[in-house]
């Protein structure tokens, strides 16, 4: 059986990535890095033939794992994707909050938390 996110007819690929913010405790920064990591080494040269309407018809579903106690600016996550329609950005508790073992106020640190986010990015139509 094949599944698809709500509003999708077909999923063409699903990729995962991870991103981190070692200084500043910004989960949004970690999340956008995770999304870029998920898509940055992919190329779909035949997208115009695979997706009805080409890039304009492409749909993107994002699922993030963010450490407990941190929030994400979903609009900033949407801005990562240069093509297609981001139909949803789901955020679950997950990822990792660990320690960088140093606090650098000049980097925006408010402690030594090191935030790691995971992302699953699905592309289809």
Language-model segments: residues:
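A generic local secondary-structure boundary/capping motif
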Residues: 2-3, 49-52, 78, 103-112
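Short, low-complexity, polybasic intrinsically disordered segments
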Residues: 69-85
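Conserved mixed alpha/beta catalytic, RNA-binding, or beta-rich assembly cores of soluble enzyme
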Residues: 2-54, 65-72, 115-125
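Charge-rich, low-complexity amphipathic helices
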Residues: 53-61, 99
């Amino acid at each position: 059986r094949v599944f698809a996110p709500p509003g999708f007819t077909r999923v063409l690929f699903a990729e995962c990535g991870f991103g981190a913010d070692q200084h500043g405790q910004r989960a949004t920064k970690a999340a956008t890095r995770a999304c870029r990591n998920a898509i940055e080494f992919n190329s779909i040269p035949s997208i115009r033939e695979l997706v009805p309407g080409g890039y304009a018809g492409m749909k993107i579903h994002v699922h993030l794992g963010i450490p407990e106690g941190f929030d994400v600016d979903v609009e900033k996550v949407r801005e990562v994707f240069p093509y297609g329609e981001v139909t949803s950005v789901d955020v679950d508790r997950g990822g990792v909050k660990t320690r960088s073992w140093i606090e650098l106020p000049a980097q925006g640190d408010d402690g030594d938390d090191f935030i790691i986010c995971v992302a699953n990015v699905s592309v289809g139509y």
